[in-house]
């Protein structure tokens, strides 16, 4: 997307990222230098993205979730993210405005990219999320959502869908905005990602 490899971030991309995220010019410029050091080509691969995510969760297995996050931001499906896509991915998974976040969450759950979500797709993402929850934390989850299957069932039940029904983006966003319980169940906001962003160690 037109990222310069000379070591300076283009003014257009800088302005766009400042507009779409809460990051400052200094933060973005600093991350860009680090990004180029790690990825001299100016692009990050699925494997590299997975490795970065793994650093946040040394005691868990974030590979599956990281792959889904990567897929949802790889807009042109070329198997890489440029700096802009990478920063937006980190922003959306750690902060993000609710509506933007829900649009992203829909694309995360729409595993096959066909514009609707099935119950099986919900289970696939929830299973990936559970791999990042420590066994200790899992013990503290309510009885009706302490396994991926139970949580997927609970989410699907909130939307009032039959097992073989599909969920559109409009239904997903409206349903989630109307019910904070769904919002809590569908998202996973890694606190460690937020902490790393604050430390500017990405």
Swiss-Prot record:
Keywords: Calcium, Cell projection, Disulfide bond, Lipoprotein, Membrane, Metal-binding, Myristate, Oxidation, Redox-active center, Repeat, Sensory transduction, Vision
GO cellular component terms, semicolon-separated: cytosol; membrane; perikaryon; photoreceptor inner segment; photoreceptor outer segment
Entry comment describing in which tissues the protein is expressed: Expressed in the retina (at protein level). Expressed in the pineal gland (at protein level).
Region Modulates EF-hand 3 domain calcium binding affinity, residue ranges: 191-202
Membrane topology: Lipid-anchor
Mutagenesis or variant effect for residue 39 to D: Reduces binding affinity for calcium at both EF-hand 2 and EF-hand 3 domains. Abolishes interaction with GRK1
Gene Ontology biological process: phototransduction; regulation of calcium ion transport; regulation of signal transduction; visual perception
GO molecular function terms noted in the UniProt entry: calcium ion binding
Modifications made to the protein after synthesis: The N-terminal glycine is linked to one of four different types of acyl groups. The most abundant is myristoleate (14:1), but 14:0, 14:2, and 12:0 acyl residues are also present. The Ca(2+) induced exposure of the myristoyl group, known as the calcium-myristoyl switch, promotes RCVRN binding to the photoreceptor cell membranes only when intracellular Ca(2+) concentration is high. Oxidation on Cys-39 occurs in response to prolonged intense illumination and results in the formation of disulfide homodimers, and to a lesser extent disulfide-linked heterodimers.
Compartments in which it is found: Photoreceptor inner segment; Cell projection, Cilium, Photoreceptor outer segment; Photoreceptor outer segment membrane; Perikaryon
Role this protein plays: Acts as a calcium sensor and regulates phototransduction of cone and rod photoreceptor cells. Modulates light sensitivity of cone photoreceptor in dark and dim conditions. In response to high Ca(2+) levels induced by low light levels, prolongs RHO/rhodopsin activation in rod photoreceptor cells by binding to and inhibiting GRK1-mediated phosphorylation of RHO/rhodopsin. Plays a role in scotopic vision/enhances vision in dim light by enhancing signal transfer between rod photoreceptors and rod bipolar cells.
Protein name: Recoverin
Lineage: Eukaryota, Metazoa, Chordata, Craniata, Vertebrata
């Amino acid at each position: 997307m037109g990222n310069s490899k000379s070591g300076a971030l283009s003014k257009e991309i800088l302005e766009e990222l400042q507009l779409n995220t809460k990051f400052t010019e200094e933060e973005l410029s600093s991350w860009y230098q680090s990004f180029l050091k790690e990825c001299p080509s100016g692009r990050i691969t699925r494997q590299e993205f997975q490795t970065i995510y793994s650093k946040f969760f040394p005691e868990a297995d974030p590979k599956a979730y990281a792959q889904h996050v990567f897929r949802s931001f790889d807009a042109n499906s070329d198997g890489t993210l440029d700096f802009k896509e990478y920063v937006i991915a980190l922003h959306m998974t750690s902060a993000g405005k609710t509506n933007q976040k829900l649009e992203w969450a829909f694309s995360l759950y729409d595993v096959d990219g066909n514009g609707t979500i099935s119950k099986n797709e919900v289970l696939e993402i929830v299973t990936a999320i559970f791999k990042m929850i420590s066994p200790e934390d899992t013990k503290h989850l309510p009885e009706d959502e302490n396994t991926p299957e139970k949580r997927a069932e609970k989410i699907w039940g909130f939307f009032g869908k039959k097992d073989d029904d599909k969920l559109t983006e409009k239904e997903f966003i409206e349903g989630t905005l109307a019910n904070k319980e769904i919002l809590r169940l569908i998202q996973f906001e890694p606190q460690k990602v937020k902490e790393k962003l604050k430390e500017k160690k990405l």
